Amino acid sequence: MSTHYLALDIGSTTVVSIVIDLDTNAVVGAASAANSSETTSATDKLIGRSEWDLDAMTELAIENAAALLSRTNARPSAIGVTGQQQGLQLLDAALNTVGPYFSWQDQRAQDPLPGQQHTYLDAMAQRGGSTATEGEMPAFANTGCPLVAGHAAPHLFWLQANNQLPSAVSGTTAPEFVVSRLVGKRPVVDPTDALGWGVYDVPKRAWADELIADLGLDQSLFPELVESCTMAGPLTAAMAQKLGVPAGLPVAVASGDHQCSFAGTVADYANTVAVNVGTGGQAALYIEAPLPRGSLELRPYIQRGYLLAGVGAVGGRTFRTLRDFFADAIHALADVQPDREALYERLVALAADVPVGAEGVRADPLFSGSRSRPRAKAAFRELTAATLTAGHLTRALLEGMAVELADSYREAIRLGSGARSKLVGAGNGIKLNPVLRAALEAEFAMPLHVGSHGEEAAVGAALCAAVADGAFGSIAEASAAFASGPPSTSAVSSVK
């Protein structure tokens, strides 16, 4: 029997395919393609819309996976899927798409109600009996996360309030939709992805039925809940032909990209804090039983347990904001359009020439606020004539990001999680940035080990497929066997 497993990661920027080999604990091959399926008009982008063609996105993911399988000659035993955990796609009874896919970036629930000062999200929060400490985002009891516009339930609430919710439809998210197309069955959802709907009862691991009713939403809009690491069904003949693999290949239920990234990165759940910096950023640790979450999120983990995670305050987009400022300034002042990707490398190099501590410059990096402080603003402080430089601003920002991520870990300890002895990093925001790596080591006060496998979320999804296929008894066992130990090239922490 083949020890290869294929996984698809349906991201908003790229779609990724990966094949792993359990015999060698290696990635056989990976392929990515830009996600070109967005259909949002320029006008709608200006008002916070984010609409996509999910059928086109699925075709793109299948084509990308087929090219990888052809190039590697891999013959997978099963297929796993992961991807963005929020958003909404409506389906009719025949499983055809109805309207566009609203991504997690779509902010229509933040629109003000006609003739009123408060938003649809405010109305939803009030109707569902949410609670919020002054200055914090509202949250429904036991849902593990604050109420945010990109979740599926707020999209449904907005559609219903505007009489745009057709009868006899149901909802799904992108990863579940892809699985549905692969197996030709109605979408189902596991607990890790159900959290992204915003109305999932985390301690009970069930839909919050009373809350859903209070919001005036019909239960039929929500997919059936199933366990992680189980099979959604066999691959259809049509999809098998597109992929170039045998029909009937087992396809696993999709799981959330954050949880899959943890599974693909962390070998020792009990003793590790995992930091991921991609477009967003998270610091997370595994716990067996629910704890009060404070300002963090309590996310169901794959099969059992939970991740206590600091989510969304800082990430790759934080550094991108500073990069874009310099790029726009260069263009405005010199009438030159700089290479924005090369500008990242140059800013990191300049930051590396600045002493640790940025000679007193401090940055509050919350350009978009945070879950606990949604109205917070970014700031640079303690600047002098000598330190108002690109290098000082960059180092201060990266060190400020490390503080925010480490504060999540310190909050988890305060809530009762216990300390961890290992720090593992994932995501290109960490792998390509030695200044940030060193800042994280300093803030967490432990060495940072960078995962040896790229595309960690896809690796985790492949491991989910392997568990569903019987290659491992649990996802924890799969992670312990496959996920990164000490990297082949250790993270350098000798930045000046």
What are these model-derived regions, one by one?
Residues 54, 66-153:
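Active-site phosphate-binding/coordination module
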Residues 32-33, 38, 102-109, 279-281, ...:
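Short, acidic/turn-prone active-site loops that include or flank metal/cofactor-
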Residues 1-100, 167, 223-224, 240-241, ...:
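N-terminal glycine/serine-rich phosphate-binding loop of ATP-dependent small-molecule kinases
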Residues 6-7, 118-143, 150-187, 198-209, ...:
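Active-site core segments that coordinate phosphate-bearing ligands/cofactors
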Residues 47-58, 145-149, 225-229, 253, ...:
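Short acidic-aromatic active-site loops that bind/stabilize oxyanions
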Residues 12, 24, 109, 256, ...:
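Short, glycine/acidic-enriched loop or turn micro-motifs at the edges of active sites
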Residues 203, 228-232:
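Short beta-strand to alpha-helix junction loop
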Residues 188-194:
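Nucleotide/phosphate-binding loop and acidic/charged catalytic motifs
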